[in-house]
Amino acid sequence: MIKLRLLFTTLLAIISLAAAAAAKDITMGFIYVGPKDDYGYNQAHAAGKEGVSKLPGVKTVEEAQVPETVAVQETMRNMIEIDGATVLFPTSFGYFDPHILKVAKQYPKVQFLHCGGLYTPGKHPANVGSYFGYIDEAQYICGIVAAHTSKTGKLGFIAAKPIPQVLRNINSFTLGARTVKPTITVQVIFTGDWAMPVKEAESANSLIDQGVDVLTCHVDSPKVIVQTAEKRGIYSCGYHANQSSVAPKGYLTGAEWDWTSVYSMYAKLLQEGKKLNDGGIPHLVRGGIKEGFVKVSPYGPAVSDAAKKDADAALAQFKNGTMVIYKGEIKDNTGKVVIPAGTELKQQDPVLEQMNYLVEGVVGSVK
């Protein structure tokens, strides 16, 4: 019996070693447009990089503060030729066209996975893919909490650019808020770029001066906006990462990423030898709260029990897949019907990734 046990243990060890050997060693390269400690977009991706780097057989390299210019092309080439990267994650929106598309053609054996871009079959190289999370689900919940908290009925949203992902966040936040208070408004200011701290502070103060009492945003680093809200004695909802430490009184909740789960999924597929080129890795990967791509920050001390109840109910619906944010009739803020009555657009519907409008209740323009 002892000999049999020893034999069984030995066989298990051999199988484990064989499985480990079968998993390919990979080098994953991560590129950020801003600093890794920005309390926001880049910090969230850097945290994901740290998470995946703990997996066996995974080596990671990274470079921060790489502008959306030809500079990112040089960074990508260096990671491939010097560091031996076999997969790259250029994380900023502006890296995609033309930079990723150009370099991907030059290195057909390297996988290029872009955060937020769209892959079009036949138009884009086969070794290019796109991943993103339905973080507008968390924004919808933030809208519920913000509406419960607001006394003026005026919410503020500071955003970088009116691209589809940003518009979707603004609209979902507004639709969530209007489930609580149907006449509440969300005033939007676009700063023009992802990291404009002076303009972000000016925009925050301007909105507060106009009666806004809850602020949120879609910029690379929400820190300035959240801090300004705290200094002015109003409330805020965070974005990308948890900013509660810079606003202990007024931070309500926030929409956060969990990139570790996403990057770990890619690492597993790549170690199995799968590629974008042969269909082993999907060209478009999306997920929300249910899939663990995004989450909601813990509630702050100013959040009421009523707000928690409604927010938790919506969270449960996202988790079980029954929540549909975009169901008609929905009008834009010019009065035009953009989603007819009886129409439901589920999160994975590609129509939502082409969003070019602001919903009713938003004060602002995409032009």
Where are these regions (language model features)?
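Bacterial N-terminal signal peptides that target proteins for export
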Residues: M1-F8
